[in-house]
């Protein structure tokens, strides 16, 4: 089940971020999320904006993501490619799982696709699992964008077929 994140979920979500950071480091992606990233402040901002979600299995929070309306300033400039559309879009950010449930990425993508006609997502060049999940969900590689700290990310977009 996917639902909006509650303030009472913050400890569980922060623990999921810890697990996700450890997974990334163990799988060759040591720099995408430095310690303390995403922060509790970022999570609180996502909750306040109404865009933070959790995935529950048997009443336990096992994953989280932000699903927010665009525009997102890190997508204003794209290199080594282009967005397939300039139509309004929603973004997926801060996707993380505790690794205990299968099909979480597919459920998150399906949730977002039910609510938007155009989606954008980005991930670190070393985050091969997220790149693979994005492609499997029908996203197309769009190019390279730069996040707020100036580091590059591989960007993907998805458009509902007419």
Residue ranges of each PLM-predicted region?
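A short beta-loop-alpha structural element at the N-terminal edge
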Residues: 1-15
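Conserved acetyl-CoA-binding loop-helix of GNAT-fold acetyltransferases
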Residues: 97-114, 132-136
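C-terminal "cap" of GNAT-fold acetyltransferases
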Residues: 84, 147-162
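Conserved active-site alpha-helix within GNAT-family acetyltransferase domains
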Residues: 106, 126-144, 151
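Conserved GNAT acetyl-CoA-binding A-motif
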Residues: 114-126
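Conserved GNAT-fold acetyl-CoA-binding loop/helix
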Residues: 21-41
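Conserved acyl-donor/pantetheine-binding loop and adjacent beta-alpha core of acyl/acetyltransferases
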Residues: 66-100
């Amino acid at each position: 089940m996917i639902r909006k994140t509650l303030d009472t979920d913050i400890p569980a979500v922060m623990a999921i971020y810890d697990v996700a950071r450890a997974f990334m480091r163990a799988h060759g992606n040591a720099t995408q999320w430095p310690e303390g990233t995403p922060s509790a402040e970022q999570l609180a901002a996502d909750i306040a904006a109404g865009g933070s979600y959790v995935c529950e299995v048997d009443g336990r929070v096992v994953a989280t993501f932000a699903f927010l309306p665009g525009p997102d300033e890190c997508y204003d400039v794209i290199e080594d490619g282009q967005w397939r559309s300039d139509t309004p879009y929603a973004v997926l950010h801060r996707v993380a799982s505790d690794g205990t449930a299968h099909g979480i990425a597919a459920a998150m993508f399906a949730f977002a696709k039910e609510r938007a006609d155009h989606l954008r997502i980005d991930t670190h060049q070393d985050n091969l699992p997220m790149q693979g999940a994005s492609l499997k969900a029908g996203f197309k590689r769009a190019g390279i964008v730069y996040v707020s700290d100036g580091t590059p990310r591989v960007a993907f977009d998805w458009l509902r077929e007419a």
